[in-house]
């Protein structure tokens, strides 16, 4: 952990704002990847020439989600607190509370969302600067039925419980302006199955299915999304220290095949439950947020680059860039120009590829009129690692 030891896990986010001008975007390279390694490459050229309006018109009208929420757990050692409003959101308009029951174990209460607590999905990402990870343990209604409880566990990459900042996001299911599909993969050993209807959503009206390809390896089929781009977020589910990441996603005919890999803390393939969300021209909540964006960090060794065009999006319609944060490997800052929404909202992130890795976030933050989000990636020993990733942000 020598390269990451200098980080201060609990340094306030706001003090980390890097007030420097971002370098001009460079043409992205593929870091030596073959075309087959690119997500959705089978139809990427076709998609680039297809107007977004045509892409959306082929999708049946889907209602907006009934409930969305997110939270920034920024006081990891405090037993009870109310998170900052600027970093959290509850579509019910009621309050949010976080309770720490023991080291690394948290319960988030979203008041007023109980009627939606037995459906939907939850995304979680560790936040900060240290090698760590956070998983979703479960989401359920409380004893009154009025409120939504989301349980989160956090760990070191070695698998020891750890007090860690985190970000968590919930949606009950829906999509308005683009494509947002998800599954809760609850049966890690079944060869092939259909996830429970309440815990999956398909914006084209289809039924998602999951296939177990081998130890720790899964294929999620999302029938219908007529896109060849988008972004994927994966979160390990359960009370163990295993972790999951996106290996790749490929446009089907029509639809998406999303490949997910899960590992033990040592990096050995391990069967595990997970949640997975795919979004294209939308955000992870599916509510068509006024401010949101995503990108695929596909060239982690370059000092600055423009991510692959078909795998980035933002509501301002501009072009995102990624800047490496020297002197360490594994540190990058994603920036969406003219999305000056300040230090608020939710950011998520996931390591990409078949090599086991952990990617955490530190954002979103406002820098020089841009919206930015830092991403830090580590290997299973806790060393900073240049690896590919996906990241998403949105403001409720």
Spans of features found by a protein language model:
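Extracellular attachment/recognition segments
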Residues: 45-396
